Amino acid sequence: MQEKMKKLMERAAGADWKLNPKWEFTACSTPQQNGLVEVEFATIAGRARAMCNAAHMNDKIRILVANEVLMYSNALGNLVVDKDQSQTHYQLMGLQNPKWAIPGAMRTFGEAGVVTCGKHGKLGDRGIPMVFVGYAENHFHYCYRMWNPASRQITESHDVIWI
């Protein structure tokens, strides 16, 4: 579904684009002219804050997983079912729901799981405890993005045992 751009609004900076749109400028420092966007910023920040609070993440961790929180919360926000048509926002825009949006199979942000990493001897650990922060893009629905608190890195894996 592609539509031709009719109008492009920006601050009075005068950037020169080759798209040949009809230009409309807004004044600087006037949030009343872009109220919907300002409200959306607050909504996204509130979602991210609520998700991190529910996962008991401190401020240092929140900064590290902020991008994951935003991607996950935006995707979840678009899965809201429309009251009148019983369709998700994805379906209303002519798109398919994400592969991971299967009822009953979705994981909770901040959920703990052990990512298996092979054997380390007979008595060694066979996995690393990590935290779920989202779903991997361009993979099967059961491929997860897991955050390792020890190394502070995000790993994609489908070998997860949920705690």
Locate predicted features:
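Anionic group-binding determinants
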Residues: M1-I163
